Swiss-Prot record:
One function term, GO molecular function aspect: ATP binding
Stretches that traverse the bilayer: none
Family: Belongs to the UPF0200 family.
The species this protein was found in: Thermococcus sibiricus (strain DSM 12597 / MM 739)
Identification of the protein by name: UPF0200 protein TSIB_0920
Alphabetically ordered keywords of this record: ATP-binding, Nucleotide-binding
Binding residues annotated for ATP, in chain numbering: 7-14
Source species taxonomy: Archaea, Methanobacteriati, Methanobacteriota, Thermococci, Thermococcales
Length: 190
C-alpha cells in the first residue's frame, strides 16, 4: 500500500508521518527530495530557491519529476514493508506516476486541512530555512503550491483530516484512520 499524504504547508502532514512511523511504516518526503536536489545544485534552501528547483525539475523531467525521483526509494522500502507513506505529493501527475510504477499496490490519498492562520502560526514556529518569514511570503507560497496542482490532489483525496484542534485530538483522528486502513500498531507509544 502506498499512502500519499497531501496538504498545504504547515497543515500537519509531518504528524501523520510520525504517527504512522510508530506503526512501523516508513516514509519518503517529496520536500526532502527537492531539498536534496537544491543542495546538489548549490541552490540555497530559501522559499525562492526551493520553488526554483521544483520548477527546474519539472521542466527537465516533466510534471511528475519529484515522483520519478522518489520511486526508487519507495520501491526499495516496499521490499521490506507492507506500506510506505509519501509525504508532500503536489499534483495528480505525481499520483499517477506512483500508480503506474506500482500497479500492484493500492494508492491512497490522505489530505490534511488547516486554516491559513493556523498554518502560518505553525510555520512561524517550525523555523526551517525554506519556511516563509512573513504573511506575504506565506500567501505567495500557497499560490505557488496551488499552481503545481496541490488543490486538485486534495479535492480527490480518499480521506480528509481537519487539523484545527489540539494535538491530542489530531493524533486520535490519525490513529482512527490508521485502524480504518487496517494498519496494525507496532511501536505505538507517546
Amino acid at each position: 500500500m502506498i499512502i500519499c499524504v497531501v496538504g498545504m504547508p504547515g497543515s500537519g502532514k509531518g504528524q501523520i508521518v510520525r504517527i504512522f512511523g510508530k506503526y512501523g511504516i516508513p516514509h519518503v518526503s517529496m520536500g526532502d527530495i527537492v531539498r536534496e536536489e537544491a543542495d546538489r545544485r548549490g541552490v540555497p534552501r530559501t522559499p525562492e530557491g526551493m520553488n526554483s528547483v521544483s520548477i527546474q525539475l519539472r521542466q527537465e523531467l516533466g510534471d511528475n519529476a519529484v515522483a520519478k525521483l522518489a520511486i526508487p526509494k519507495v520501491r526499495e522500502l516496499l521490499k521490506t514493508h507492507e506500506a510506505v507513506i509519501i509525504e508532500g505529493v503536489r499534483s495528480l501527475d505525481e499520483i499517477q506516476a506512483f500508480k503506474d510504477a506500482f500497479p500492484e499496490e493500492k494508492v491512497i490519498i490522505i489530505a490534511v486541512h488547516s486554516s491559513p492562520q493556523k498554518r502560518f502560526e505553525r510555520l512561524s514556529k517550525r523555523g526551517r530555512s525554506d519556511d516563509p518569514k512573513s504573511w506575504s511570503e506565506f500567501e505567495a507560497r500557497d499560490w505557488k503550491e496551488l499552481k503545481f496542482g496541490l488543490g486538485n490532489v486534495i479535492a480527490l483525496a480518499d480521506y480528509l483530516i481537519v487539523n484545527e484542534s489540539h494535538l491530542t485530538q489530531y493524533r486520535r483522528k490519525i490513529e482512527r484512520l490508521a485502524e480504518r486502513l487496517g494498519i496494525k500498531k507496532k511501536y505505538f507509544t507517546f
